[in-house]
Amino acid sequence: MLIPKRTKYRKQHRPVRRGMSKGGNEIAFGDFGIQALAPAYVTNRQIEAARIAMTRYIKRGGRVWITIFPDRPLTKKPLGTRMGSGKGTPEFWIANVHPGRVMFEIGGVSEDVAREALRRAIDKLPMKCRVIAREGGDI
């Protein structure tokens, strides 16, 4: 699973979810990609589930690139705990994804295989997404 090797601080503030993506809006490595249409926190487990769904479908052909990284810890207090007494412990790591961000890319496979593999990965993600091609248009 994707987690940072080390961080300067154990806990961070929650990231802002509004606004459009400032960079990473175009396909950089592969031929097809998944672009976010809504803001969301994507956990390291969701990224891994999407990666497995894609790689299992394309089998040995092609290559997958993950262009987001879960670098923010999200804290949670235990169930049944009263309010107060400090911030909770880090539960999981998230990537803050803004609309327009390309999260996964795939290359080296046919368009039909790429479309189906990316559709399976989209089912694992918590927000609305679309499949885009390197030319810039929808598939």
UniProtKB/Swiss-Prot annotation:
PROSITE patterns: RIBOSOMAL_L16_2. The gene is rplP. Pfam families: Ribosomal_L16. This is Large ribosomal subunit protein uL16. Residues 1-21 are annotated as: Disordered. One of its GO terms (molecular function) is tRNA binding. SUPFAM superfamilies: Ribosomal protein L16p/L10e. Transmembrane segments: none annotated.
